[in-house]
Structures are given as structure tokens and as C-alpha cells.
Regions:
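Acetyl-CoA-dependent GNAT
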Residues: 33-37, 104
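Core segments of cupin and vicinal oxygen chelate
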Residues: 1-34
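Vicinal oxygen chelate
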Residues: 52-98, 103-108, 121-126
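A short alpha/beta connector and helix-capping loop motif
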Residues: 117-118
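Short, solvent-exposed beta-strand edge segments and adjacent coil->beta transition regions
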Residues: 47-51
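Short glycine/proline-enriched turns and hinge-like loops at secondary-structure junctions
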Residues: 14, 44-46
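Short beta-strand/turn micro-motifs at beta-sheet edges
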Residues: 37-43
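An amphipathic, aromatic/His-enriched active-site/gating alpha helix that lines ligand/cofactor pockets
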Residues: 111-112
Length: 126
């Protein structure tokens, strides 16, 4: 989150086992807690956190740039989708949690038709 997505660590608690991170939009968006040998997330459909989404810009060029940076850092892009209202890349963080890196599409689409948020997902090619 810090090295590849630009989050800044703003502090630690629990004797250094938890770090608060911010993208600069608010006091913190993430609180990551080290839990030792805890099992990873369950596979497939499950209860709990599905994924987090992080907006990286406002254009497909910015999403392409993010994809290139992530791939150059050795991150595997597991999928890419066009959601009509946004375009997204999907990857896993080091703990196996799914992270969606996205840019918003034309806001007039969902403002004119709020149901566009649940439009069928289309493939995205970058």
C-alpha cells in the first residue's frame, strides 16, 4: 500500500503491530494489523471483506500507468473489468486480500441512470 500505491504511514499502535496509512484524502483509510501466524483469507464466496477499491485517477491513461507500475514491481494483475461507471484492475495484497485499483468513468452516465452501477461487467483491455 505504501510502496506501490503511494499511501503514507501516519502512525503505529499496539507496540508497532498496527500501522495507520493515508492516501491524503482523510486522516487514514487503512489500519493494517500484524497478527502473526493467523490463517489467510478463505477462498471463494465467503462472509467478510470481499475487496477494497482504491481510486488511482480519472482516466484510462492513468489506469494504464498504474498497471505498468504495478507490473514493473512484480505485481500480478489477476483481472481487468469495465463496469460502465468505472474501469478496474484486480490484484492481491501480500496477505491475499483482493484490491481493486480503479478510475471512474463518465459521471454523467450514473447520474443520468443510477442503475448503471449494476450494468453487466465487460472485459477491459489495456
Amino acid at each position: 500500500y505504501r510502496d506501490l500505491l503511494g499511501f503514507k504511514e501516519v502512525g503505529r499502535i499496539f507496540n508497532g503491530a498496527a500501522a495507520a496509512l493515508t492516501s491524503g484524502r482523510t486522516h487514514h483509510e487503512l489500519l493494517l494489523i500484524q497478527v502473526g501466524d493467523a490463517p489467510g483469507p478463505a477462498q471463494g464466496r465467503r462472509r467478510g471483506l470481499y475487496h477494497i477499491g482504491i481510486k488511482v485517477g480519472n482516466s484510462l491513461d492513468e489506469l494504464r500507468s498504474a498497471k505498468q507500475e504495478l507490473e514493473q514491481a512484480g505485481v500480478t494483475i489477476e483481472g481487468m473489468s469495465d463496469h460502465t461507471v468505472s474501469q478496474s484492475l484486480y490484484l492481491r495484497d501480500p496477505d491475499g486480500n483482493e484490491v481493486e485499483v480503479y478510475v471512474d468513468g463518465d459521471e454523467s452516465v450514473w447520474k443520468r441512470d443510477p442503475a448503471a452501477v449494476v450494468s453487466p461487467i465487460k472485459p477491459l483491455y489495456l
